[in-house]
């Protein structure tokens, strides 16, 4: 599985148009999220992943990097190109 540190991701995020998939639950997402993130909770991912463009690279984030790692595993098995954002939103809150 491809991974990126939060700091490296955030540099890209600030300068480029990225596809960011946030796999936290809806209430977590509504409390705090990065602008432009697409919320597809891990608990519903098997039913909603087909909303994603298969021709695009997707960065996947959660609170700490654990759920996003599971989501990356699932999405890569479905043929998606994904990168797990290590540290997740906890790293963002520490900025």
What does each model-identified segment do?
Residues 1-19, 26-57, 66-95:
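Rhodanese-like catalytic fold shared by cysteine-dependent sulfurtransferases
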Residues 61:
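Short, surface-exposed ligand- or partner-binding patches at beta-edge/loop junctions that are enriched
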